[in-house]
Amino acid sequence: RVLCHGDSYSPNFLLSEQEEMSLIDWEYSGMGDPAGDLGTFIGCSNYSVEQAEKVLEIYLQEVPDTKTKRHYLAYVAVTSYYWFLWALFQESVGKPVGEFLYTWYRFTRQYGQLSLELYLGEK
């Protein structure tokens, strides 16, 4: 368990003119699995699976073994589902979230299926 941001998507990363990066909006932070932050980052993108795997390599600074890869990619499904439910609530109270609703739904299904295949040894 490590300190996790909990809402690690691109608008919360600020880059100064000196190219120093800051991470803002810590309201969802707490101790947790670092795969959750990367799962949210990928889940809030429109990356293909191949691009997501490259992001994972960059994040880990190495090519992950199968166990690590499936763990992190499963978190894309888990966090996408979490944010999908959040989005449904927002929509229900008149606060549209735009295309994120569909992206999170799609990634929940896509990465959930991929992760299941990886856990079952089918990929």
Stretches with model-predicted labels:
Residues 85-123:
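ATP/Mg2+ or Mg2+-diphosphate-binding catalytic cores
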Residues 35-64, 77-95:
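Active-site activation/catalytic loop segments of kinase-like enzymes and analogous catalytic loops
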Residues 1-36:
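Active-site acidic catalytic loop and adjacent metal/ATP-binding pocket
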Residues 53-71, 111-120:
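Short amphipathic alpha-helical segments and their helix-coil junctions
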